[in-house]
């Protein structure tokens, strides 16, 4: 909290560490300084200092409210959106708190990520970005958030998008192969079940020939 970089993706690296520590602590009343589980979770979500901004302040600063685009190059943007999506899952799983409802720009930011794609479905590599394929983890997190909070429209939208970009996801072999093993799995991961009735979307539904993102001063 005392050190770090507050206004870009590094802020989220710090917030993730603080959040993981906070989740394993006892309640505030169990500590002489009053800094327990509630203190650190509240700090991540709502409080800012010179070197560490809250999730809400950072989102207000970095996301374009109209386009959902994060104000860095696609590589860093994907990392930031993925970190926010993982926070969504942590809040759902451990706190029964809908972070997407509290911060609607997150859903828009995830939905906008296909705009980074070239026709070969690799992301454009402007700035400090290496061309590669778009991560689909944040789509999974939006589906899990929708399932946890009864949001069928959101679930159907991101399920169709996920099936469009990753048609192999959903079969048993792929799911077993992609099981993550890390300390975060104690707080986040639950098996993903996709609605088989939702058909894959068409790529044309998620991209446009020209997309203007003024906060990165680029035509994507």
Located regions from the model:
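Aromatic-lined, polymer-binding surfaces characteristic
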Residues: 1-123, 127-132
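Carbohydrate-active enzyme catalytic cores, enriched for enzymes
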Residues: 76-220
């Amino acid at each position: 909290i005392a050190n770090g970089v507050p206004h870009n993706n590094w802020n989220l690296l710090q917030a993730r560490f603080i959040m993981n520590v906070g989740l394993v602590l006892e309640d505030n009343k169990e500590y002489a300084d009053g800094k327990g589980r509630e203190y650190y979770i509240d700090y991540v979500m709502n409080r800012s200092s010179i070197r560490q901004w809250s999730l809400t302040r950072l989102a207000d600063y970095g996301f374009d409210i109209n386009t959902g685009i994060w104000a860095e190059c696609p590589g860093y943007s994907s990392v930031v959106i993925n970190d926010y999506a993982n926070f969504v899952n942590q809040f759902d799983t451990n706190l029964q708190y809908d972070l997407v409802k509290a911060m609607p720009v997150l859903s828009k930011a995830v939905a906008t990520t296909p705009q980074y794609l070239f026709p070969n479905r690799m992301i454009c590599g402007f700035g400090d970005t290496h061309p590669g394929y778009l991560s689909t983890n944040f789509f999974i997190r939006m589906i899990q958030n929708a399932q946890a909070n009864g949001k069928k429209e959101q679930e159907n939208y991101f399920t169709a998008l996920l099936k469009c970009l990753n048609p192999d996801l959903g079969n048993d072999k792929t799911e077993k192969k992609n099981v993550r093993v890390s300390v975060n799995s104690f707080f986040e991961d639950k098996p993903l079940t996709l609605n088989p009735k939702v058909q894959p979307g068409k790529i044309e539904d998620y991209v446009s020939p020209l997309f203007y993102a003024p906060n990165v001063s680029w035509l994507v």
